[in-house]
Every structure is written in structure tokens, then in C-alpha cells.
């Protein structure tokens, strides 16, 4: 599924992105900066996120590769005023080599992996 229109605008202007996975102990949420995602670039159907720690996220993805991202910004006009959100669901895995990892490491020397999200559903909110 493509990230386009208002959803793309929200993702490009968001300050932070929440990342939710689920493992044997239940749901787990971490976050990353929107600038990190935008520095890598946003292809139409996937999102690449630099990974510093996120060890529990990685363990959860090995058990269940489903993921949900949530972002928002007041820079995009919402239905009732300033502010629009976006929920992105899909599947993900950690890459420690290859093109996506190389792109992440070239910009973020501290990154130990690239979290690559294959987008399956995009919903705007607010």
C-alpha cells in the first residue's frame, strides 16, 4: 500500500513516531524521531527507521512481525482544527546488512540495524 496524500504529509512533518509491537509479555511501544525517518527518505510502500537499541521490539518481531506506527502533527490541517494524525500498519523486520542498512548507517553511525516496515494499511486520524 502506498503512503500518499495527507498521510505522507503528516509523516513528513511529524516530530516523532510511536512504534508498537506485541510479544509474549503483551504490547510494547517505543518511539523514534520523525527527522530520522525523513533523513532516510520515505518510499511509497515502506518505511525505514534507524535502530539504536529497540531490543524488545526486535524480539517481539521475531515472534510476530506485525507492527503499527502512529504519528501526528499540528502542521497539517485536521477535520476540526490544526492537527492531523496517521496510523500505519504492516509487517517489519530488522536488517543488519543490505541496501536499507547501508542507507541508515551512512546517516546514523550509531545505528545497529534498520527497521524496515512494509506498509499494508494507512489511516488518517483527527
Question: What function would you assign to each model-found segment?
Answer:
Residues 1-126:
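Binding-site signature for planar aromatic cofactors or substrates
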Amino acid at each position: 500500500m502506498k503512503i500518499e496524500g495527507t498521510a505522507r504529509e503528516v509523516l513528513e512533518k511529524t516530530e516523532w513516531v510511536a512504534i508498537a509491537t506485541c510479544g509474549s509479555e503483551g504490547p510494547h511501544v517505543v518511539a523514534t524521531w520523525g527527522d530520522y525517518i525523513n533523513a532516510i527518505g520515505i518510499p511509497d510502500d515502506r518505511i525505514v527507521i534507524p535502530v539504536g537499541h529497540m531490543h524488545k521490539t526486535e524480539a517481539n518481531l521475531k515472534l510476530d512481525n506485525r507492527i503499527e506506527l502512529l504519528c501526528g502533527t499540528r502542521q497539517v490541517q485536521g477535520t476540526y482544527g490544526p492537527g492531523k494524525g496517521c496510523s500505519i500498519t504492516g509487517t517489519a523486520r530488522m536488517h543488519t546488512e543490505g541496501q536499507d542498512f547501508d542507507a541508515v548507517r551512512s546517516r546514523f553511525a550509531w545505528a545497529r540495524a534498520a527497521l524496515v516496515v512494509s506498509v499494508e494499511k494507512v489511516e488518517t486520524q483527527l
